Amino acid sequence: FRRVLFRSKTLIEQGDTERAIHALTNFIRNDAHVNDEPYYLLGNAYRKMGDWQQALNNYLEAIERNPESPAVSARDMIMNILNFYNKDMYNQ
């Protein structure tokens, strides 16, 4: 369990987000009782790729599994970014 998460975190940090997403998705698929951490890491990988919707979806799943998850602050950060850009779109 920890090895998969550590490896995925390292892949994300190295920019190999597609491999991290694949590993985490397989891990989640094979263990229905996972905690929030794989979803938080998936959110990070999607955020790094610029896929805001998938990032939010995974952060929300992490928060549902653990309301104290670090995904709470990650979700808030994305919402602030999206709100900022949406305001800019209205001012053009």
What is each PLM-predicted segment?
Residues 6, 40-41, 74:
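"A position-specific structural signal for the A-helix of alpha-solenoid helical repeats
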